[in-house]
Amino acid sequence: MKKHWIAVDWGTTNFRAFLLNEQQVIASVAQPCGLLTLSKDAFAATLHQHLAPWLTELGALPIVMAGMVGSQQGWQEVPYVAAPANAVKLRKNALPLSTPWGSPAWIVPGVSSASAYGLPDVMRGEEVQLLGLNALHPAHEHHAILPGTHSKHALLRKGEITHFSTLMTGELFSLLSQHSLLGRALPEQQDNSTAFVEGVLTANAGIPFNHLIFSARTRRLNGEIALSAVHSYLSGLLIGYELSTMSAEKESWVVGSPSLCERYLLAAQALDIPLRTADGDTCFLRGMAAFYAQLPETHA
């Protein structure tokens, strides 16, 4: 197995690649060339363009890709793997690709599952972070939150993703703050932890959701929250409502960027929910390394 290899996180809006020596990151590149900006026949050329300096220096390195690159709108669709899923199962169902320059490449499949509420659910990319979390912090069971546009609440047992539920927290915030009455005619917004926590606590008062979010307007109108803190309050409402589904008796992990983890940790503290944080990039790379370790010696 080659020591040098490339891990790629290719999503809807962004492309990120990491050059690794086994598990150590040597270099990285990030570009705003997600799948929404590319036609089907442009993926190979785009990939080569951004990896060219590494390929020139080190040759046709193995490439492992994860994320929406394997969706219907991506380079090639890779069918979801049904939970329970671990690194071995993901490897067996990965899609091998031939690149024009000779690098062996694979796209990691996403995972499908019934949610905690019995509805169908899917993820692409987050499965890698979950496997990385388990590799970094081995335990019989993990309850994990992966915040973002579509936040995932997942359960892992014995290193396998057993089931998960998607909550559209990030996308709802974007829609409500940018395209609804709640975000209209606001001054420049400032982070306000007091308003955020007030939103978190309000969201856990048993108020119907459609009524709850309207308080981002009425509390602004009556002066209970500053005009510059509406986004902080709205964020608190949405994250607080998301966390209302969690048990205060079980410790959970939040896996993501430092800024998002800090926000979720603040909300959890306000609700007395035990929560630990893990860096999303670190978990992603460790999960990709777990996948890479499963590849046949003759290819990697």
Where are each of the predicted segments found?
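Short glycine-rich, Thr/Ser-proximal phosphate-binding strand/loop in the N-terminal lobe
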Residues: 5-42
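Short glycine-rich phosphate-binding loop at a beta-alpha junction
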Residues: 59-71, 148, 239, 250-258
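ATP-binding/phosphotransfer module of carbohydrate and carboxylate kinases, centering on a glycine-rich
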Residues: 15, 20, 181-300
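Short acidic-glycine loop/turn motifs at beta-strand connectors
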Residues: 21-24, 101, 155-160
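Short beta-strand-loop/turn "lid" adjacent to the catalytic site in phosphate-handling enzymes
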Residues: 56-120
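Phosphate/pyrophosphate-binding loops at sites that engage ATP/ADP/AMP, CoA/4′-phosphopantetheine
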Residues: 49-62, 243-250
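Glycine-rich phosphate-binding loop plus the immediately following alpha-helix
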Residues: 38, 111-147, 152, 156-206
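A short acidic Gly-Thr/Ser loop motif
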Residues: 8-14, 68, 145-150, 169, ...
